[in-house]
């Protein structure tokens, strides 16, 4: 099994620190979208979001998101996570936007997205719980 993980590299170690599965961590800013998910069992996508009137994806994630039709996600299990600020109208809206697009392209959502108020470090128990549920869903 290989988990393809697209998000900030430090997040890879925090989300799935103790899995024996092969984890292929990639920074969204550094990947080519072409076939990114092909041959993968699971693809995880992490992206911060902000914006008061509408969801704004993290700037370095936007080019990848705009090319999602080329990532080859059809039939691949997917899950998403984001950190954000709960005072914003669209709290962690990146999760909703990314999940919707992956589902539209034939990805198989296996778990409700993780939405964290603040950062991964300050939400350790929530991250651990989500990671355990993710691994159980595989």
Annotate the PLM regions.
Residues 3, 7-27, 34-138:
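FMN-binding flavodoxin-like domain, especially the glycine-rich phosphate-binding loop
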